[in-house]
Amino acid sequence: MAHKKAGGSTRNGRDSEAKRLGVKRFGGETVLAGSIIVRQRGTKFHAGTNVGCGRDHTLFAKADGKVKFEVKGPNNRKYISIVAE
C-alpha cells in the first residue's frame, strides 16, 4: 500500500486587500463639488485652487469645474486645481 505522511502546516497565505488608490478624475474632466479626484497615501499630489484635502490625504473638488494638473514651485510639486467653466 502507498502511504504519505501528513504535510506540515504553513504560516503563510495571507495578504491585505487592495486599497483602490490612484487618480479617479483626470485632467480636463468635468467634476461636481464633492467629487473625489485622487486617493493617495501621503501628499503625492497637493491641493490647489478649489480642491480640499481629506484626513487620509484624499483630494476632492470644492466647486464644480474642470480638473487641472500643474507642476509648480521650487520643489516641482504636483498640484491639482479645479478651474470654473
From Swiss-Prot:
Which residue intervals make up region (Disordered)?
1-20
Give start-end of the signal peptide: none
Known Gene3D superfamilies for this protein? 2.40.50.100
Q: Which UniProt keywords apply?
A: Ribonucleoprotein, Ribosomal protein
Task: Output a single Gene Ontology CC term carried by this record.
Answer: cytosolic large ribosomal subunit
GO terms, molecular function: structural constituent of ribosome
Annotated Pfam families: Ribosomal_L27
Q: Which cysteines are joined by disulfide bonds?
A: none
Family matches, as PROSITE patterns: RIBOSOMAL_L27 (PS00831)
- Cite the SUPFAM superfamilies for this sequence: Ribosomal L27 protein-like
Q: Name one GO biological process term.
A: translation
Similarity comment: family membership? Belongs to the bacterial ribosomal protein bL27 family.
Q: Which NCBIfam families match?
A: L27
Query: What is the protein's name according to its record?
Result: Large ribosomal subunit protein bL27
